């Protein structure tokens, strides 16, 4: 929100009760980062999805620890924006859904592990520089060793895959 409200009163809208550039009054909320990762993945933009993951990673902000003022391994709910005297400071780190939305963006988006009623769709969207990756996953009582190779260095699309050492047709693992 730009510009933030500077007059404080409460009419039912939260933006009026917070200082400018914090929380709902112009702060930068983090929870949407996971959805951006997932959206780019679903569009097949593996490079951009992984770029968003890296940009939102708490570890990526360790060189700004004195500004961020949070543990180096947690997401904050929001970050104070540029007009704040504390621009870049993050808050409410143990009371946010950011970690879970980023996890969904990474697991279901980048790694492409999307469960449905019949089984598991595997449709990764990865950086074109990756040669592939392996995942060990327990899924509905079964252990899966999934090996995804990317010899053509594409960002999305599954030509073939192996699960528990056996070739699987398509990109679906049946629950049966």
Regions found by a protein language model. Give the residues of each.
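Extended glycan-interaction surfaces of carbohydrate-active proteins
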Residues: 1-29, 61-86, 156
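Short, mixed-charge aromatic SLiMs
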Residues: 9, 57-67, 125-137
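Catalytic and substrate-binding regions of extracellular carbohydrate-active enzymes
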Residues: 13-14, 27-28, 51-57, 172-173
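Carbohydrate-active enzyme catalytic cores, enriched for enzymes
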Residues: 22, 33, 43, 78-176
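Alpha-helical support elements that line or immediately flank enzyme active sites
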Residues: 33-49, 53-56
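A generic secondary-structure signal for well-formed alpha-helical elements
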Residues: 44-47, 56-64, 110-114
């Amino acid at each position: 929100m730009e510009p933030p409200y500077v007059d404080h009163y409460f009419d039912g809208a939260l933006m009026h009760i917070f200082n400018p550039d914090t929380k709902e009054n112009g702060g930068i909320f983090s929870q949407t980062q996971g959805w951006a990762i997932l959206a780019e993945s679903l569009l097949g933009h593996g490079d951009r999805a992984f770029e968003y993951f890296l940009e939102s990673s708490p570890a990526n902000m360790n060189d700004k620890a004195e500004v961020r003022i949070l543990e180096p391994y947690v997401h904050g709910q929001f970050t104070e924006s540029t007009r704040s005297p504390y621009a870049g400071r993050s808050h409410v780190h143990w009371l946010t859904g950011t970690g879970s939305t980023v996890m969904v963006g990474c697991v279901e988006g980048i790694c492409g592990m999307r469960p449905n009623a019949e089984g598991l769709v595997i449709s990764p969207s990865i950086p074109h520089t990756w040669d592939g990756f392996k995942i060990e996953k327990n899924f509905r009582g079964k252990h899966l060793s999934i090996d995804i190779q990317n010899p053509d260095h594409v960002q999305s699309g599954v030509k073939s895959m192996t699960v528990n050492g056996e070739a699987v047709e398509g990109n679906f693992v049946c629950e049966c």
